[in-house]
A protein has these predicted regions:
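C-terminal all-alpha effector/ligand-binding and dimerization domain
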Residues: 156-225
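Short helix-capping/turn signature of helix-turn-helix
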Residues: 29, 147-148, 194
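Secondary-structure transition/hinge residues
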Residues: 15, 19, 91, 95, ...
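All-alpha effector-binding/dimerization core of bacterial HTH-type transcriptional repressors
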Residues: 52, 66-135, 141, 145-148, ...
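C-terminal regulatory/oligomerization modules of transcriptional regulators
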Residues: 124-126, 133-158, 200, 214-225
Length: 225
């Protein structure tokens, strides 16, 4: 990766985990510090971050980390749903044996994950596999920000909920296992079931927020920092 790509990766990771919290207004100096880079690579990275919806242009106030929004999450899921269904269909037809072996190994690992941080990492790996095994770089590039911002929403809105690891795993494992068998119908069905679950999760968060009069959750992982 060049310096601009490194800056993009650092900033997206910090936005996803809440280290740069939802709604934060960031100056160029703050972004340079967070990205651990210089002004030129940062400005190149910022153009991409705005295009990919990781940052919002804030006029003279600086750049803003997008607030957590149920409407935005549902819009992302509408697009991601179709792209991931396409991805698993392509993977069943195109993935080579080495790629399928990597998926099978990941499924075995996913079954053993117990704590939330390890599960978060496993979800990220699941998303990476869904992008790469389709062997279509345009599809992969489209999925990167959608998956990352969806993970941010999930982290911010489900932290502390019981059985969240088991609930998510119950959808990822069948979809990925179907890919290892090259069963495109089952893989697509698994992905669509996952997205039904994610949409319900977003709506459940909206209902909880309305009941408690809260419009935005605290930043994920903020406790103990």
């Amino acid at each position: 990766m060049n310096k601009s790509e490194e800056a993009y990766a650092r900033l997206t990771q910090k936005i996803e985990t809440g280290e740069l919290p939802p709604g934060a207004i960031l100056s160029e100096a703050a972004l340079i510090d967070a990205a651990e880079t210089g002004r030129t690579p940062l400005r190149e990275a910022v153009q991409r971050l705005i295009r990919d919806h990781w940052l919002l242009a804030g006029g003279g106030r600086g750049l803003q980390v997008p607030p957590i929004s149920v409407d935005d999450q549902l819009e992302r899921l509408e697009v991601r749903r179709s792209l991931e269904a396409l991805a698993v269909g392509l993977a069943c037809a195109r993935a080579d044996e080495e790629q399928l072996a990597a998926v099978a190994a990941h499924v075995r690992h996913l079954r053993t994950v117990e704590d939330l941080p390890a599960y978060v990492a496993a979800v990220g790996r699941s998303h990476e596999l869904l992008r790469t095994i389709a062997n279509n770089r345009y599809l992969a590039d489209s999925l990167v920000p959608l998956q990352g911002l969806c993970r941010r929403f999930w982290l911010a809105t489900t932290k502390g909920l019981p059985d969240e690891v088991e609930r998510g795993r119950a959808f990822y494992v069948p979809a990925l296992e179907a890919v290892t068998r090259r069963d495109s119908a089952e893989a697509r069905a698994g992905v669509l079931a996952l997205h039904d679950f994610l949409a319900r999760s977003a709506l459940d968060y909206a209902a909880r927020s309305a009941a408690h009069g809260s419009a935005e959750p605290p930043a994920p992982w903020a406790e103990g920092r």
